[in-house]
Amino acid sequence: MSIKLINIGFGNIVSANRLVAIVSPESAPIKRIIQEARDRGMLIDATYGRRTRAVIITDSDHVILSAVQPETVAHRLSTKEEVVVEDDE
C-alpha cells in the first residue's frame, strides 16, 4: 500500500488518504468548526503566522489550518507531483 503525501505549504505535508474536505475559512460554520477543534485540542496550525486561507478536515477529526489557497491544495492533490511512500506491509 502506498501513502500519498500532499504539501500544504511551508514544508508541511499531510497524508492525502486521510483528507475529508478542503474548505475556505470565511463562513461562520467553518469558524465554529475551527473553534471547536481548538477547544478539543485537535487543531493543527500550519500557517506560520500568516493568514489562514484553507481549512483541511481529516477523517480523524483533526482540523488543519493552511496559508495556501484551497484551490492550490486541491490541485496538488490531483497532480502527479506528490510524494509517494511505499509501505512494506
From Swiss-Prot:
Transmembrane segments: none annotated. It comes from the Bacteria. InterPro entries: RemA-like. Belongs to the RemA family. This is Putative regulatory protein CPE1749. It comes from Clostridium perfringens (strain 13 / Type A).
